[in-house]
Amino acid sequence: MSQVLLVTTNYWPEPTGIAVYTTDLAEMLQTEGHRVTVLTSLPHYPWWKVPSEFAHLTEGTRSHDGVEVIRANHLIPTKMNALLRVRFETSLWRNLRRVSKTKLGNDYDMVIACIPTVAAGIIGKKIARSLGIPFGLIVQDLSGAGAKQSGLRG
């Protein structure tokens, strides 16, 4: 049985695209016999806040459908522009990094990062490199929507 670390910004209970995909991926790997840990953010998308029904999903470790889920606190802007996008990504990076150093073990066989956020990719790669294990990157979205939400044109 291999031990997989999935690093992503979007995970259950978020109801849209990337969270649905990463949740299905983690649960499928777990069903296939792998031990899966997810390092993720607070549930915030598409609401840009933590809804009251998910307020109990604060920073810390919990299990959901057999998958260990480790969440990190972070800035959640209520509106998005270019500056707030940078602050959001920076907050994700700092807090995922901090939590990865205090809550994760070193017994993983591989790290998978699922992005559109740069933070998840960077943290996943650094963890894999520090443990000397394989790293996989799934590019789910190239942040075109993020650029549009931030008021950037291209």
Segments from the language model and where they lie:
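An aromatic- and histidine-rich active-site surface loop
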Residues: 85-97, 110-133, 137-140, 144
